[in-house]
Swiss-Prot record:
<dbReference type="GO" id="GO:0021675">
    <property type="term" value="P:nerve development"/>
</dbReference>
<dbReference type="GO" id="GO:0005615">
    <property type="term" value="C:extracellular space"/>
</dbReference>
<dbReference type="GO" id="GO:0007169">
    <property type="term" value="P:cell surface receptor protein tyrosine kinase signaling pathway"/>
</dbReference>
<dbReference type="GO" id="GO:0048812">
    <property type="term" value="P:neuron projection morphogenesis"/>
</dbReference>
<dbReference type="GO" id="GO:0008021">
    <property type="term" value="C:synaptic vesicle"/>
</dbReference>
<dbReference type="GO" id="GO:0043524">
    <property type="term" value="P:negative regulation of neuron apoptotic process"/>
</dbReference>
<comment type="similarity">
    <text>Belongs to the NGF-beta family.</text>
</comment>
<dbReference type="Pfam" id="PF00243">
    <property type="entry name" value="NGF"/>
</dbReference>
<dbReference type="GO" id="GO:0030425">
    <property type="term" value="C:dendrite"/>
</dbReference>
<protein>
    <recommendedName>
        <fullName>Neurotrophin-3</fullName>
    </recommendedName>
</protein>
<dbReference type="InterPro" id="IPR019846">
    <property type="entry name" value="Nerve_growth_factor_CS"/>
</dbReference>
<dbReference type="InterPro" id="IPR029034">
    <property type="entry name" value="Cystine-knot_cytokine"/>
</dbReference>
<dbReference type="InterPro" id="IPR002072">
    <property type="entry name" value="Nerve_growth_factor-rel"/>
</dbReference>
<dbReference type="GO" id="GO:0030424">
    <property type="term" value="C:axon"/>
</dbReference>
<keyword id="KW-0964">Secreted</keyword>
<dbReference type="InterPro" id="IPR020408">
    <property type="entry name" value="Nerve_growth_factor-like"/>
</dbReference>
<dbReference type="GO" id="GO:0008083">
    <property type="term" value="F:growth factor activity"/>
</dbReference>
Amino acid sequence: RCKESKPGKNGCRGIDDKHWNSQCKTSQTYVRALSKENNKYVG
């Protein structure tokens, strides 16, 4: 996720600031991928 209200060290915050650098677009795509995988496990 890219939250402008609470910018991290690189301007973007996610599950882990170390892995979620300043690439908001990449992080959002990664979140979608994780969400799809989680849906498979849940459903």
